């Protein structure tokens, strides 16, 4: 058993693609946790999607043994964290389980907005932060400039930051020696009542729900009767273990340790991330602080292409929910798409990943509607409704006010691209709050309506700044504005899945752009298809998809004009009847046309 003084719990904070997972691989290699044959790149990124996209989505942990220069053996618990803005809650949980963090910055690119946000989270948890300059082997690396950036933007002294290259394996031992020197050992009383923080939980087909915990006080061993403090659910511990990165069962998890607990938990609600485990017979006086319910920010309708898949779709969502506390869903029906679910996500990347996992891991074919945000609607009789689906908006005469969510965005951009980025924010109805120049980079603070950001703001930001700008945002408040609901009618029938809420000033332009896109996407039918955008009873834009028609005069060689007219009239009658009963097939791209409607 390792003494508490010789334990170090730390995580790695880095922006997407700054080399965090590669650095973790090097730590595992140096500590000899896996043989060379067992090493695969990005060991901690276990999901296929994580490796393909090169991003970390779920928090992972690994226990390593390291013999330091002072001759002592230390136990490291490395908790790998996601770097993308959508997963900031997973980051805050991982950081709450640590005493220190490595701030990994790409020595060629410099500090990015996401790292700044995560750094502030780490400082709120009173963590010791060690800056590391990675990718020092790149020709474009400029360590001095990046050191100045860290000091100016993050406010951390960086003169002694370790220079390393995770790819080449240089500077790795130096980083680990620095971890031993600078990061404090865990505080906590082995004799006190058990308090263990749930960092993550996931579903395993053989073991049921596996719960990843950090023991703050006391210890956990098999046979113990435990209780979740927020959920008040009792369990009996069956097994405890650690990842080295292979799973290894151990006799007990002592104070300061990070490991997993298997206790017959059947659902993720049974062990919610951020809850505290304690003993039934000797409970702790209070749960660990700082945890909140995760609130989804972005909503979309997901529908199976084949309605027979509805039940398997529900089961797949429930299984994903086991691993993903932030995913929320409830049944919903649409006239156009049948039965499906309204799903809530942390952001667009989270939405894409969930949809991709459903299609890949559960072999489902899904149609998704355009994402929306939550609006507050004040009705004329004084009720406040939270609406995430535009189709559920009450009739216009019953609405007193619609309030849209506003976010505060921090955007880091090189000075060269400042103009286009400001123009983009202004175009999206942003209000500038602050601008700060620091050594070639500018930190912009803007207030933006969330529905302007949720569609394609990130893509546009990357394209106007050649990929150099980065952004992090948080919800600020709800604000009332002149918002209207726009309906799309196909042959006079409302298509509920394409309704959306827009600002009155841009509604006509957006309506015109959307019907033009739909005209190009809806395939031609045997009858004419009218596409209209309407606000209330007023049609603001219209396009038509022309009918396909058979040449009914092909057999008439010369002959009487009245014969030809008769055939044409007969065809016209048939088309009219078809239009009354005909059903228009709407392709999946059409439902996402809303997303692209303002690409100019």
From Swiss-Prot:
TM annotation in the entry: none
Q: Where in the cell is it found?
A: Cell inner membrane
A GO molecular function assigned to this protein is: translation elongation factor activity
- Presence of the UniProt keyword Cell inner membrane in the record: yes
**Reactions this protein catalyses:** GTP + H2O = GDP + phosphate + H(+)
Q: Which CDD domains match?
A: EF4_II, EF4_III, LepA, lepA_C
Q: Where is the tr-type G domain?
A: 5-187
Q: Name one GO cellular component term.
A: plasma membrane
Stored InterPro entries: EF-4, EFG_III/V, EFG_V-like, EFTu-like_2, G_TR_CS, LepA_C_sf, LepA_CTD, LepA_IV
Q: Name one GO biological process term.
A: positive regulation of translation
UniProt KW Glycoprotein keyword:
no
Against SUPFAM superfamilies, the record matches this protein to: EF-G C-terminal domain-like, P-loop containing nucleoside triphosphate hydrolases, Translation proteins
Documented EC number(s) = 3.6.5.n1
Q: What keywords were assigned to this record? A: Cell inner membrane, Cell membrane, GTP-binding, Hydrolase, Membrane, Nucleotide-binding, Protein biosynthesis
Pfam families documented for this protein: EFG_C, GTP_EFTU, GTP_EFTU_D2, LepA_C
Q: How does it sit in the membrane?
A: Peripheral membrane protein
Which residues are noted in the entry as GTP-binding?
17-22, 134-137
- Supply the PANTHER family for this chain: TRANSLATION FACTOR GUF1 HOMOLOG, CHLOROPLASTIC, TRANSLATION FACTOR GUF1-RELATED
Functional summary from the UniProt entry: Required for accurate and efficient protein synthesis under certain stress conditions. May act as a fidelity factor of the translation reaction, by catalyzing a one-codon backward translocation of tRNAs on improperly translocated ribosomes. Back-translocation proceeds from a post-translocation (POST) complex to a pre-translocation (PRE) complex, thus giving elongation factor G a second chance to translocate the tRNAs correctly. Binds to ribosomes in a GTP-dependent manner.
- Give the similarity note: Belongs to the TRAFAC class translation factor GTPase superfamily. Classic translation factor GTPase family. LepA subfamily.
* Protein name listed in UniProt: Elongation factor 4
Native species of this protein?
Acidithiobacillus ferrooxidans (strain ATCC 23270 / DSM 14882 / CIP 104768 / NCIMB 8455)
The gene name reads lepA
